[in-house]
């Protein structure tokens, strides 16, 4: 369970509701929840939510849009990617290979749940050329990362579209306010009409910053974690195939992990590592 995402979204909406409720009748107390009615407008909902949804549909393939529930499920039920655990498994394989040879890895590989890890081990068990193995695995990582990037970009585009349609709604409201203004009746309704016009901008900003941006950020973070683990697998498998010492392999991978943590080892387009295909 991704508690930080849930706490952030729920906490953000709660604070917004409290903020919108402050400043009512003093006799009621510090919070006047009847003021929430001031922030409700059906036309604004249609413009912002409808316009944003139309942008998502028009700009993305149907297969990707249909996986929206899956994307949300990934975020809420976030699987942890543990690079240290990956290193431990690689060292275990290195010890088996050093003691019994590469062919002895097949039995242990069949017990792996990660298809990418299993594929990587089986490629060296089958005696494939090391350069071809690296190229194949790196290509898999790049393709996975590209698909993940497309998914995250969909939500980033939605976060840009929501405030834009909020502004469209505001302009529509202002136009209607000016057209319907009664020259003889004065400007007594301008404040109310202006408030309604600004509600669409409010909806757009909330939708962008409390819904779409957090989703996109979580998906990108998850992609980075997956890609890091996959790259560790590639480096480890290559070291096993070349017959390197298990202790040296551990130090090498831990050094790679430390370099990545300091920002020096992130090479997304060259093939960052990960485990799984959740965002596809």
What are these regions (language model features)?
Residues 7-10, 14-30, 140-222:
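Helix-termination/interfacial motifs at the ends of transmembrane alpha-helices
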Residues 3-5, 18-152, 225-280:
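Large intracellular
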